[in-house]
Each structure stands twice: as C-alpha cells, then as structure tokens.
Curated annotation (Swiss-Prot):
Species whose genome carries this gene: Salmonella enteritidis PT4 (strain P125109)
KW Cell cycle (keyword) present: yes
BP-aspect Gene Ontology terms: carbohydrate metabolic process; cell division; cell wall organization; lipid glycosylation; peptidoglycan biosynthetic process; regulation of cell shape
Protein name: UDP-N-acetylglucosamine--N-acetylmuramyl-(pentapeptide) pyrophosphoryl-undecaprenol N-acetylglucosamine transferase
Function as written in the Swiss-Prot or TrEMBL entry: Cell wall formation. Catalyzes the transfer of a GlcNAc subunit on undecaprenyl-pyrophosphoryl-MurNAc-pentapeptide (lipid intermediate I) to form undecaprenyl-pyrophosphoryl-MurNAc-(pentapeptide)GlcNAc (lipid intermediate II).
Lineage: Bacteria, Pseudomonadati, Pseudomonadota, Gammaproteobacteria, Enterobacterales
Reactions the enzyme catalyzes: di-trans,octa-cis-undecaprenyl diphospho-N-acetyl-alpha-D-muramoyl-L-alanyl-D-glutamyl-meso-2,6-diaminopimeloyl-D-alanyl-D-alanine + UDP-N-acetyl-alpha-D-glucosamine = di-trans,octa-cis-undecaprenyl diphospho-[N-acetyl-alpha-D-glucosaminyl-(1->4)]-N-acetyl-alpha-D-muramoyl-L-alanyl-D-glutamyl-meso-2,6-diaminopimeloyl-D-alanyl-D-alanine + UDP + H(+)
Membrane topology: Peripheral membrane protein
Protein localization: Cell inner membrane
Keywords from the UniProt entry: Cell cycle, Cell division, Cell inner membrane, Cell membrane, Cell shape, Cell wall biogenesis/degradation, Glycosyltransferase, Membrane, Peptidoglycan synthesis, Transferase
Family designation: Belongs to the glycosyltransferase 28 family. MurG subfamily.
Length: 355
C-alpha cells in the first residue's frame, strides 16, 4: 500500500455479536497496514474490550429507544442529533477513508455522521433479519452485506466473521473419527445463561442416563444451582461451568450443541462443523429463529421454539441421533459455513476505500 495508510472507523457496540465480528475485520485490516479506530459507547462491553485489542476507541452518548416510554421517545430526536454531532466531530479529527457499521445503537448516528461528511458507509448485518438501525442506514450506505440470506433482498451473503481458533479446528470427519462412548452434549446459554436450558437439561440427562455426557455452561451466578439440579436427578457426573473461556476447545470436545441461536453462535457452530439443537430467544422480530433456519434447512440442526423445548422432545431427539447421523449433520453444518467471512468483509471495505 503506497503513501499514507488507509483509515477505517468501525462502528459497533452493545453485544459480542456486534463487537467480535468487528474486531476480526479490524485485526485483518490492521495486519495489512490500515489505521483503525472504533466508535462506541462508554457504558457497554466495547469500552473495555476494544482497547484490550490494541484499538483506540471514541465514545458517543446514545442508547436504545425500544420500550423506553413516551418521554424518552419525545427526547429521542435531540439525543440522536447530539450523538450525530459528537460522531461528526470525532470523524472530522480522524478522517477515515471508510466507516464500517457492524450494528448496535452507535451505528445510527455514526453512519449518518459519516454520510454527512461524504465518507463511504459499509454495513454488515449479522442477523437473519435486519435490525432497525441497519434497515434505516441501508438507504444511505455505499455497500450492504449480510451474514444470512433474507435480511436484505439484494445484499451479498458473506457470513459472519468468527474467531480464528474456531476456524482452525479440524474438519468434522477428522475430529469425530473413531469416537465412541456417550454422546458429548455441550449446553451453552451465552454469557448470561438461559433459564430454560438450565431448568430442562438436567431432566434430559436423567432420561438419557449414561448414553450422554454433558458440559453445561450455566451463565453467571447459577453454577451451583444447576449442579444441584443435575445431582438432584441422580446425574452429578456432568460438568457445569459458569463460563467457558476457550469456546474452540469446547466445540472440539462436543458431538452436538444445545444453545440459543444468536448470530455469532450460529456462525461459529457452522464454522466448527457441529450439529445443534437451537432454542431461539423469544424476541418480537424472531431474529434468532431466522439465524438458525439455514442450518435446519441444511439438515444440520433442529430448532425448538421455547414452548416446544420440553424434556421429552429434547431427550427423544438426542436419543434418535446415532454417531453416524451426527457426523453427517456436522459435515452439512460445515458445508454451509462461510469460513472466509472476515476476508470478504475486509475486501469490500478495501474496495470501497479505493473508489
């Protein structure tokens, strides 16, 4: 790259599903000599996480508007205007060649500020149904990309950038070759846990007995309660942890995953090549259902909406999957993954910066 290094501002915040894909793209472009700064909010996870990755972060004051009542809605135009002014001042100082919106409340005023300064806006939608901010920003964006088909009618499907340690796992046919014994079930409720998984899976374990071995990530503050639930049904041998620091190692251990279907989780499971039982969070937009649907359609997963996630249904499903069936599902999951998603997003950012 000749002359001055290109400059990227990443706009992403709030949840890991927005921040981690943004970090993957940022690191990829930094390795090519780009200068990267981040636009976020001071009270969400990006405030601590992004600087730990060696990336400078600027903050604007903005939060969500859903469910805040009439008073908050009346104040919203002024809040958005102030956030836009803050973002505009930050971008005037940094002078990015392109901004990349990865979702979260910060992308709205940030994207509008970039557009008002003539800076190209590249959007990436992680979920199977577009969020309100991205629906609105798509009208002014230079390029829109999507992880799953259907969020936008004409956007390129590029997948979700996932962690390199997950991408580095051996392929299912190598990883699962020669395995026997109990089916290894990884239960993941996300960092906050999932009450329905914590309540249901010990009962599933009791039904399945020694045909399964379970590693259950309970979420914060309930590890002891979940351990007691397993012990209370005569299944104290299963492993319960509050968090799993090394998800790649957990995926490598597992034969099948039982989990929510956040966008990043679904993409990681596909990249790892794992069968799954997905229990979508019951959101008004059914966002997590749409995230999981491509894997179910590919024959790699089963979706249980929360009311259908019963002890009997889950136990019968797991009991009905032989090791041969699980390997076939694992291969199907890997086949629909897009392992070069990070490179695809970074390539589009580079293309837009050159034009």
């Amino acid at each position: 790259m000749s002359g001055q290094p290109k400059r990227l501002m990443v706009m992403a915040g709030g949840t890991g599903g927005h921040v981690f894909p943004g970090l993957a793209v940022a690191h990829h472009l930094m390795s090519q000599g780009w200068q990267v700064r981040w636009l976020g909010t001071a009270d969400r996870m990006e405030a601590d996480l992004v600087p730990k990755h060696g990336i400078d972060i600027d903050f604007i004051r903005i939060s969500g508007l859903r469910g805040k009542g009439v008073k908050a809605l009346l104040a919203a135009p002024l809040r958005i205007f102030n956030a836009w002014r803050q973002a505009r001042a930050i971008m005037k100082r940094f002078k990015p060649d392109v901004v990349l919106g990865m979702g979260g409340y910060v992308s709205g005023p940030g994207g509008l500020a970039a557009w008002s300064l003539g800076i190209p806006v590249v959007l990436h939608e992680q979920n199977g149904i577009a969020g309100l901010t991205n629906q609105w920003l798509a009208k002014i964006a230079t390029t829109v990309m999507q992880a799953f088909p259907g969020a936008f009618p004409n956007a390129e499907v590029v997948g979700n950038p996932v962690r390199t340690d997950v991408l580095a796992l051996p392929l299912p046919q190598v990883r699962l070759a020669g395995r026997d014994g109990p089916i290894r079930v990884l239960v993941v409720g996300g960092s906050q846990g999932a009450r329905v998984l914590n309540q249901t899976m010990p009962q599933v374990a009791a039904r399945l007995g020694d045909t399964v071995t379970i590693w259950h990530q309970s979420g914060k503050g309930v590890q002891h309660t979940v351990e007691q639930a397993y012990a209370g049904v005569g299944q104290p041998q299963h492993k319960v942890t509050e968090f799993i620091d090394d998800m790649a190692a957990a995926y490598a251990w597992a034969d099948v995953v039982v989990c929510r279907s956040g966008a990043l989780t679904v993409s990681e499971i596909a990249a790892a090549g794992l069968p799954a039982i997905f229990v979508p969070f019951q959101h008004k937009d059914r966002q997590q259902y749409w995230n999981a649907l491509p894997l179910e359609n590919a024959g790699a997963a089963k979706i249980f909406e929360q009311p259908q996630f019963t002890v009997e249904a889950v136990a019968d499903t797991l009991a009905g999957w032989s090791r041969e069936a699980l390997l076939t599902m694992a291969e199907r999951a890997r086949a629909v993954s897009i392992p070069d998603a990070t490179e695809r997003v970074a390539s589009e950012v580079s293309r837009v910066a050159r034009t």
